[in-house]
């Protein structure tokens, strides 16, 4: 495959529910994750749901970072997609997992581009 980008789908469990429900914290965390990975932030949009949960996106020149949080379950669904090979999406994904105090993390790493997607086995990290 002619790789045009790398995509990490991250499942985070046993996260800090207060952090998962704090829109300001999550927005700062995601912008910081993008910047720490070397990305250039273009747009930021986050929404707080009632009674709980946050969804948001950080658009970067190289693609995007997204989250959907479920504080009532201690769970967050995170995507980090970067075009090219200058930015390492794993840097941002790791920073986000640590920032949400995730005790269990599962990643699926995909190469995106011109050709069929090959889906590898998920990699699970438990930090109990």
Swiss-Prot record:
The record marks 62-63 as: Cleavage (non-hydrolytic). GO terms for cellular component: cytosol. Gene3D superfamilies: 3.30.160.750, S-adenosylmethionine decarboxylase domain. Its cofactor is pyruvate. The modification Pyruvic acid (Ser) is found at residue 63. Disulfide bonds: none annotated. It comes from the Bacteria. NCBIfam families: SAM_DCase_Bsu. This is S-adenosylmethionine decarboxylase proenzyme. It comes from Exiguobacterium sp. (strain ATCC BAA-1283 / AT1b).
